[in-house]
A protein has these predicted regions:
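Transmembrane helix segments
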Residues: 65-72, 187-234
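Transmembrane helix boundary and interhelical loop/hinge segments in multi-pass membrane proteins
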Residues: 97-122
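Membrane-interfacial helix-loop-helix junctions in multi-pass membrane proteins
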Residues: 211-273
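Hydrophobic alpha-helical transmembrane segments of multi-pass membrane transport/permease proteins
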Residues: 47-72, 81-100, 140-142, 202-209, ...
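Junction motif at the cytosolic side of a transmembrane helix
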Residues: 2-18, 254, 261-309
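Alpha-helical transmembrane segments and their short interhelical loops
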Residues: 124, 129-200, 205, 263-264, ...
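Aromatic- and glycine-rich beta-strand/loop motifs that create alpha-glucan
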Residues: 2, 12-58, 291, 308
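Hydrophobic alpha-helical transmembrane segments of membrane proteins
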Residues: 77-104, 171-176, 181, 188, ...
């Protein structure tokens, strides 16, 4: 990472203040260090045109598709463009948690970030807090941009009342909680960044087309619906549709309703699973790091012409 992030690593090592005054609680130190590191990484992101353009391009693609579609969802008077925009909103959250975050973690592991965390008291918790902050800001910013641009440019959907805004808030929050720890767990076990992208992209693209995000889920074969219902994207998209589409659009859902209790249950289950996997896998990845491993990876990367920056 950058020199600024290295400064945040060093800041995490401070256990007590000069003069022997009482040091703050461990949890408070983790949160303070995590927010410090997260703030540095956010500034780095905002100053990186390449990374910003990647997120903006996803919004542009969604808007172009929304502008192109003119039919209604079969069996309803809801524009297909509205269903697709709601689905893309869910997919952008899903993508940031399960594609962008693992890539960030794998890249930073190749650069030696996990090795530095081994020598940093409370390094893993602070690191996770920083990544959660980064992902939440990226995701909510992208979602807000998509919804605002869609409403202004292609007559896209927006929540119609306080209840729908509340649904949008809790589905977005719970959806991120479901995918961010899972993305961290995946990033802890994946190989180098190029292979990581290949391994993650195909399954996530398959879920995009089978989870009802870009097609009415009732138009898909029943076995496909059943497989998709295991994964969080289907329920994230369904929850966002409930917030953004009129109640008449429920006719295109499998159960004929939004099933919001099931949305909450499935996303909560994935949240618990993700947290149970993420922390031990990241700790294991940090313990396995060594100077010799890092040097060997850099040599292989140099030979292949993919040396980390």
């Amino acid at each position: 990472m950058t020199n600024e992030t290295s400064t945040a690593d060093k800041a995490e090592t401070t256990d007590e203040t000069p003069g022997g005054s009482k040091r703050p609680g461990r949890t408070a130190r983790h949160w303070r260090a995590g927010f410090l590191r997260g703030g540095i990484e956010l500034r780095h992101l905002l100053r990186n045109p390449k990374e910003m353009s990647g997120h903006l391009s996803n919004v542009v693609v969604a808007l172009l598709i929304g502008a192109y579609l003119s039919d209604d969802v079969p069996g309803t008077h809801t524009p297909m463009a509205h269903l697709v925009l709601a689905g893309f909103a869910a997919y952008l959250l899903f993508q940031i948690g399960l594609i962008n975050l693992p890539q960030i973690l794998v890249t930073e592991r190749e650069e030696g970030a996990l090795l530095r965390l081994r020598a940093t008291p409370g390094g893993i918790p602070a690191y996770l807090i920083a990544k959660c902050l980064l992902v939440v800001v990226m995701a909510t910013g992208t979602l807000a941009l998509l919804l605002a641009a869609a409403a202004l440019l292609v007559d896209g959907p927006l929540p119609r009342g306080p209840g729908d805004w509340l649904t949008l808030l809790w589905v977005t929050t719970l959806g991120l909680l479901a995918v961010v720890p899972l993305g961290a767990a995946i990033g802890a076990v994946l190989p180098n960044p190029r292979e990581a992208l290949a391994l993650i992209m195909l399954p996530t693209m398959a879920l995009l087309f089978t989870s009802g995000a870009v097609f009415p889920i009732t138009s898909l074969p029943v076995p496909v619906q059943q497989v998709a219902s295991v994964f969080p994207l289907k329920w994230m998209a369904q929850g966002l549709r409930s917030a953004l589409l009129p109640d008449s659009a429920r006719a295109a859902e499998v159960a004929g309703s939004w099933e919001l209790p099931m949305v909450a249950l499935v996303l909560t289950a994935w949240t618990v699973l993700g947290f149970l996997l993420a922390v031990p896998l990241l700790r294991r990845a940090a313990r396995r790091e060594s100077g010799s491993r890092l040097t060997a990876r850099h040599r292989r990367a140099a030979r292949s012409g993919a040396m980390p920056a």
